[in-house]
Amino acid sequence: MNFFQAIFLGLVQALTEYLPVSSSAHVRIVGDLMLGGDPGAAFTAIIQIGTELAVLLYFRRDIWNILKSWCLCLAGKEGKDRASRFGAHNKDARLGWYIIIATIPILIAGVLFQHAIETTLRNLWITVAMLFIFGVILWIVDDRARQVKTLDDMNTKDAIWFGIGQMLALIPGVSRSGGTITFGRAMGYKREAAVRAAFLMAIPAVFGAGILEAVKAIKDVNADAMFPGWGATIAATVVAFVVGYIVIIGFLKFVSTYSYKAFAIYRIALAIIVAILLLCGVLSPLEGIPVSGNA
């Protein structure tokens, strides 16, 4: 992968990260078409840090209020009893706890199935299946779901379900925002609330994965044949940050007016196109993916 290819993949990452269309699937597919192989889990995870930095910037006030309230409650400033420490009387502190709870499923699955995530699950046929299946599910759920809940209505059970939706996004093609949004809509959350939950809950998971992959790359920079080098990777991450911030603004305006049907249709259409390309031999389902036996 050269410098300009890395930049282009950073652009693809930014344009698709926040939409329920799976950025990892797009980076994987575009990488295969452009490079003849998978760009790699390390590069993908690191450039996702750029898009999450855009989330930090856009939601900086919300994040600050959540962190401040969570710390104050934990320190007993809102009351010494257990309920107060866990945010019983402070909605921002409660949301902080729910974000932590929602992060646990993806953390556990990421550790237990790391090798499969980096190898077997990056098979393009799996990506095609997930694009199609979750496209259909998103369409049905968004069309039939009620719009009654906001983030103030969240409880522990909802946070766990949000976390499960986010955990499924470890499989390319599901989409981190798509999984979280779909589960949120199924629980009756308004579209805007489901999107905000998806953005906020992704921060710990994405930063954690990106930092871990960066550490691994530093330890053995030659382990990934597709890794373009740190200069190109950092440049791609910056592109993902700048373009990603613009996409956040546009996406939030879109969901305040329209449904997710357009994204569901896009997912289904993309799945069909990629399946045809695979059947015709234009794309290879396993090209560039490390052999799963090399644990």
Swiss-Prot record:
Q: Pfam families from the entry?
A: BacA
Q: Under which EC number(s) is this enzyme classified?
A: 3.6.1.27
Give the main localization category: membrane
Quick one: signal sequence residues? none
Per the record, its GO cellular-component terms are: plasma membrane
The lineage's top-level taxon is Bacteria
Q: Does the keyword GTP-binding apply?
A: no
Which InterPro entries does the UniProt record give? UppP (IPR003824)
Which intervals of the chain form a coiled coil? none
Q: Which UniProt keywords apply?
A: Antibiotic resistance, Cell membrane, Cell shape, Cell wall biogenesis/degradation, Hydrolase, Membrane, Peptidoglycan synthesis, Transmembrane, Transmembrane helix
Q: Annotated Gene Ontology MF terms?
A: undecaprenyl-diphosphatase activity
Q: Where, per UniProt, does this protein localize?
A: Cell membrane
Which EC class, in a word? hydrolase
Give the stretches traversing the membrane. 39-59, 97-117, 121-141, 198-218, 232-252, 263-283
Q: Say yes or no: keyword Transferase present.
A: no
Q: Please, one GO biological process term?
A: response to antibiotic
Membrane topology per the entry is:
Multi-pass membrane protein
Q: What reaction gets catalysed by this protein?
A: di-trans,octa-cis-undecaprenyl diphosphate + H2O = di-trans,octa-cis-undecaprenyl phosphate + phosphate + H(+)
UniProt family annotation = Belongs to the UppP family.
Query: NCBIfam families annotated for this entry?
Result: PRK00281.2-1, undec_PP_bacA
Give additional notes from the record: Bacitracin is thought to be involved in the inhibition of peptidoglycan synthesis by sequestering undecaprenyl diphosphate, thereby reducing the pool of lipid carrier available.
PANTHER family recorded for this chain? UNDECAPRENYL-DIPHOSPHATASE
- Any idea what job this protein has? Catalyzes the dephosphorylation of undecaprenyl diphosphate (UPP). Confers resistance to bacitracin.
| Protein name stated in the entry | Undecaprenyl-diphosphatase
User: Per the UniProt entry, what species is this protein from, by scientific name?
Assistant: Bifidobacterium animalis subsp. lactis (strain AD011)
